[in-house]
């Protein structure tokens, strides 16, 4: 069984990693490259999976399914890669993959445990792509409205939905 990682730790980890790079647009491909991860943007049929992190022969491989819209530098592709980076950087996920406790295919995993692990990786992705310290500066004392969210989504190259969720998580107060 994999233990849950506190969200505060996930946020701190993702923000720390993002802020190692000066670019406002978190360079997820560069992060993967700097970690020595091999990325594969390939077609695996639509609906099979978005992304998958595999540990094999003492090395991590990340597969991104372009048939599901996960093209390099697309909003969906960036979020999926950031999510997969969550599986790599969150200790419990990485160790679980290394020890075979976690398997790359959801159908072989305990549903409740899988949901928690996937939510943690989603939260990591959100924090990595929209680090609170940078994002807070953009939304400080601004009212939530569609134009603001659309503008921020474009600036951070994320979906409007991901941006709206992040705005709701962080808020626009001091």
Predicted regions and their residues:
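Active-site hotspot residues in diverse enzymes, especially metal/ion-binding acidic/histidine motifs
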Residues: 1-174
